[in-house]
Curated annotation (Swiss-Prot):
Encoding gene (name): ygxA
Source organism phylogeny: Bacteria, Bacillati, Bacillota, Bacilli, Bacillales
This protein's name: Uncharacterized protein YgxA
InterPro entries reported in the protein's UniProt record: NT_sf, NTF-like, WH-like_DNA-bd_sf, YgxA-like_substrate-bd, YgxA_HTH
Superkingdom of origin: Bacteria
Amino acid sequence: MENLLRPIYQERASHPNTLAVIMIERRNKTSSLTDNFDAALLVIVKDADEPVFIKHYEFDHQTASLHVVTDSQIQEWILLGTNRRIIDWIVNGRVLFDRNEYVVELIDRLNTFPFAERKLKIGLEYGKLIRRYVEGKAFFEANQFLDAYNAVVHALHHLARIEVIDRGFHPETTVWSQVRQMEPQVYKLYSELIESHESLEKRLELLFLANDFLIHSKAEIGSAHLFEVMKEKDIWQFGELLQHHDLKHFTQDLGVMLDYLTEKGLINVCQIETKGQAVYHRGYSFKKGVDSDS
């Protein structure tokens, strides 16, 4: 396969804009890692008009895909976890070209997993966990048990990823095999939801009780990034938090996250006067003493 792709990747490698070329070969008959192509070629570049550019090839009854991706897009995928297979590609792919040890340094950073990045990723997962939990509970109370089940499964996935990240690892596409070793309690919850012979309603009822406890127990690490921002000044309006540079990735889940933390008494709320009579802006402030740094 490499010989067939050589003209493609050598032409790309000759560009000064190219940082690395990595080949990922199909491992199984069904391969989500390569979208069922026989191989995927990842070309990482400094910059481009489009952050992601993809081409498909066919030759000698074999198929391959070419992915030209900017360095900034790679960093965003790693940070936000929005393309989980990218880590597998980088760590397990075959490096065909590596300018100035770009891939070596990238893998070293993945292995080191700086604390600030872990804190941000945990915060993002925590917001998604709360979102799915609230959605699931709403479905459950409306007797929409299948939709509630779907939401709870997603919530457990976010909880699983928090456990993995908190231990200094990046969540893999097979996150449950990681969690089984790292946090058997969370793995057991997932197994009971999937395998229990109880009625779906009963399974969900028990899961919501357990989830409520676990979400609250993760509040300190899950909110650490948000609390760090909120310490910058005494009172915040929601729009101010939303526009803060360090919270730009929280936009979708920040509202539900603040509501949950307020309900649990971890954030203070105050009223800020408006021009309207008896109408107030809601102000949020960090409640001192809720984290270990205070």
